Amino acid sequence: MSHKHLLFIPAYNCEKQIVRVIKKISSSKLLTNFSEILIIDNCSEDNTVEVANKEILELNLKQARVVQNNDNYNLGGSHKTAFNYAVEQKYDYVSILHGDDQGDINDLGKVFENQVFENYDCMLGSRFNRNSKLINYPKFRIYANLAINLVASIVTFKFLSDLGSGINMFKVDYLKNKFYLNFPDDLTFNYSLIFYIAHSKASFFYFPITWSEDDQVSNVKLFSHAYRWVIILIKFIFNKKALFVNYELRKKDYFFNDL
């Protein structure tokens, strides 16, 4: 059975890395699985858009295109833009691969193999799976992530081995009620998303990935990020509605422009 499958690539100030990402996709055996490759630029201040378009043309990657958010929606907002697009264009599945070249497109092969994805709502890449490979990843961040994964697993009664890697796949039917519009636009979007997945009793599994840090520039401010994580955790424990329902955010529009 064939499926209409979107590959979404969020990009922000990654002119060096996005070229490598596009090259890897163009040479991947998984390329034919994607009906469209949508690179969503979040108002980059460098030449991300220009170099991405140039690489797409040079490689004749016909199903790929670069668009740009109407405003800087942050990483979470870019996800909302892509999810809305996948729902409205009646895609069956949407995969996510960050444009900073930390993840590897070929890791999705574990999900495409024997069409495993047909049996689940969410397929989540895990940096901390026993079969995953971390390259140049700081030890203190490994331990910090393992700690928050453990806490999240305890409060959700689900085994959660990663609360937000940059490579995932979702069944679009699962996204149709647009629950994700309630979540923050910032880098904690994935925390809320994973907590919702666990709470909603969605079918999901984690798959191992290779994750590398080379010349990427992190946008994470550790202390403010940790504070927001604690707030999300408290809301999940004591007031799930405060975490999963945000009428103001649901009113916000998320649009992109073709370039």
PLM regions and their residue ranges:
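Cell-envelope/extracellular polymer assembly enzymes that use nucleotide-activated donors
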Residues: 4-6, 36, 192
